[in-house]
Amino acid sequence: MRKVKPARKLGRTAAHRKATLSSLSTQLILHKRIETTEAKAKETRKVVEKIITKARKGTVHAQREIFKDIRDKEAIKTLFEEIVGKVGTRNGGYTRVIKLCPRFGDAAKMAVIELVDFAEAPAAAPKAARQDRSKRVKGSRKTEASAAKAAPAAQAAPELPAESDAPAAEAAPTEE
């Protein structure tokens, strides 16, 4: 009896799906964080988890097995030198999938997939911006707008007398 395998087809043929997942895995290893659709991120997570587990063995055989999936020497070098060194004691769970808002063009569910030990804290910068906005005093927009209008007027005012002096100086020496 036919049984269904629990995997996403991603709307591709088997060869195209394998190539897509290979490419996404390579980019994840090189960049440590990529943004893609949610389905591709979840499938990439499966592939990358297995690759990193093989890489932790550190043998030549493991390198050759991984090269079947990745096919990029720079990515394999990064995997064995940087990533395995950081995740050496971790037993699985090397990646994280974070869901994002839908893509603007086609409303596809988007996600970020990243290596856990290489995650940076991008949330620190937006919090600082929010604090600056919340400290704004009522009516300060009007004062900022009037100050912005006054500043260009103040800068433009000194230029006008300088230009008016030059034509007068040129007009005076003409005698016939």
Swiss-Prot record:
Biological process GO annotation list? translation
Q: Which HAMAP family match?
A: Ribosomal_bL17
Tell me, what is one Gene Ontology molecular-function annotation carried by this entry?
structural constituent of ribosome
Into which family does the record put it? Belongs to the bacterial ribosomal protein bL17 family.
Where do Low complexity bias regions lie?
145-176
**A cellular component annotation (GO) from this entry:** cytosolic large ribosomal subunit
Q: Which UniProt keywords apply?
A: Ribonucleoprotein, Ribosomal protein
**The protein, known as:** Large ribosomal subunit protein bL17
Q: Which InterPro entries match?
A: Ribosomal_bL17, Ribosomal_bL17_CS, Ribosomal_bL17_sf
Q: Assembly state and interactors?
A: Part of the 50S ribosomal subunit. Contacts protein L32.
NCBIfam families reported in the protein's UniProt record: L17
On the tree of life, the source organism's domain of life is Bacteria
> Record's Pfam families?
Ribosomal_L17 (PF01196)
* PANTHER family linked: LARGE RIBOSOMAL SUBUNIT PROTEIN BL17M, RIBOSOMAL PROTEIN L17
Q: SUPFAM superfamilies from the xrefs?
A: Prokaryotic ribosomal protein L17
Entry keyword Ribonucleoprotein: yes
Spans annotated as Disordered: 124-176
**The species this protein was found in:** Chlorobium phaeovibrioides (strain DSM 265 / 1930)
